[in-house]
Amino acid sequence: LIDDAVARVIRSKGGFIWACKNYDGDVMSDMLSTAFGSLAMMTSVLVSPDGKYEYEAAHGTVTRHYYKYLKGEEASTNPMATIFAWSGALRKRGQLDGNEALVQFSDRLEAACLDTLNAGIATKDLVGLMEGVEAKAVNSADFVAEIRRRLEEKME
């Protein structure tokens, strides 16, 4: 039964792929990502029977942060899911086209993101969840700047 499966997934250490129909996958992925920290860390890949792929951030829009931005106020929106959706799509495009440079760029972009988090630099939604490092909360622009700096180092 689905309720038992969800309970087992939440208690598990992972290591498996769970294929769901669209609605079930949407509801369960949101619940699971929240149980493990932040919906903003979750990406989604939709694969059609005819081989088409769609990569997306699972969280949708963050309208309250956008309205703060429009007012000139600081926002601390976590861009990780969006970045990983793009990197996943770019990697897949590189694989389909035999473009190894694009695949490597995607790998380096994701590594730069993880290096930033491992250095203790994160948006506000993640700082309280970080263990083992002295965490520093930064706004969206500063977080992206930190990722960019690390990506540029990896591209040299």
Which functions belong to the PLM regions below?
Residues 4, 8-108, 115-116:
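Glycine-rich phosphate/nucleotide-binding loop
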Residues 71-77, 92-156:
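Internal helix-turn-beta structural module
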